Amino acid sequence: MSITPQEALQRCIEHRELFHDEMTAMMRLIMSGEMSPELVAGLLIALRTKKETVGEIAAAAQVMREFATSVQVDDRTHLVDVVGTGGDGAHTFNISTAAMFVAAGTGAKIAKHGNRSVSSKSGSADVLEALGVNLALSADQVAKCISTVGTGFMFAPNHHPAMKNVVPIRKQLGVRTIFNILGPLTNPADAKRILMGVFHPDLVGIQARVLQALGMEHALVVYGRGGLDEISLGGPTLVGELKDGVVREYEIHPKDFGLNTAPTNSFKVANAEESKKIVLDVLDGKPGPASDIVCLNAGATLYVAGIAKSIASGIALAKTAITSGAARQKLDTFVVTTQSK
């Protein structure tokens, strides 16, 4: 090994970057349980204090993927993940979860990777479970769902068993670490297209460049101004787009797409059951701000998936998927398929 954990810690304390092979070696020690909890905690805090670089995050993500239980999808046409880092503190209903069924209703193949709530009132796994989805699927069963239904959900604990070495340390620390931003970068189906929400504007450019380093085909990394890890109806959304190997950053606004603005707090929920009700209302065609924000995010998903030529045309397709009943049908078929395993 080119560096010891103690040397890596010292380097971070001095605000010096770890090289790719060094970060790779450190992450392998962490994920395998070979590094002591004290050193893991120290290194995580030192990395956070100096601010993790694009190279360090990319190396860490690659190691997490090495240790993950992968999902083998044969037909990868229009395969896309729609995911958020969480941690935005907005406590909204599960916008991206609703958007996945709308996008699937238009022909996207969704390989969604998510977990239970950490800081929100309802994580993607929580609301899917409330909707009747069986989370305890094997990797092969998830792959079959994606190929037959066009929708698959990879419950993070089922695919990242090595995280058991890190979870107790993260809980004890109680602060954000690099692991808060690694989850969305470690899709077990290796989807090359992604709509990713982040909890801080600084992460938009960083995560877009990490995705670039990881060889993604097309990605939108978004931060809703005012604090939302989705594309917002409350005002501008900062976007980092990776396309054709190039990253560019810009802002979009709901009015760009003919949508009315709505404050983020109008989407707040107290628990997964409340989130479930809004998701079902949207998929059943109830008009209003909740439907608008889902169509906005589904439209962006369809753009990234390569089905729509723009976010605007994606929104139009998303609205049709709802009014035709295709989006609700995707949910119902997905629930039945997961329960029949």
Curated annotation (Swiss-Prot):
Binding residues annotated for anthranilate 1, in chain numbering: 84, 115
Keywords for the protein's UniProt record, in alphabetical order: Amino-acid biosynthesis, Aromatic amino acid biosynthesis, Glycosyltransferase, Magnesium, Metal-binding, Transferase, Tryptophan biosynthesis
Binding positions for 5-phospho-alpha-D-ribose 1-diphosphate per the UniProt entry: 84, 87-88, 92, 94-97, 112-120, 124
A GO term from the CC aspect: cytosol
Top-level lineage group: Bacteria
Cytoplasm found in the keyword field: no
Cofactor note: Binds 2 magnesium ions per monomer.
The protein's enzyme class: transferase
Protein family membership: Belongs to the anthranilate phosphoribosyltransferase family.
Subunit structure as annotated in this protein's UniProt entry: Homodimer.
Biological role stated in the UniProt entry: Catalyzes the transfer of the phosphoribosyl group of 5-phosphorylribose-1-pyrophosphate (PRPP) to anthranilate to yield N-(5'-phosphoribosyl)-anthranilate (PRA).
HAMAP family according to UniProt: TrpD (MF_00211)
Protein name: Anthranilate phosphoribosyltransferase
Species name: Polynucleobacter necessarius subsp. necessarius (strain STIR1)
Source taxonomy: Bacteria, Pseudomonadati, Pseudomonadota, Betaproteobacteria, Burkholderiales
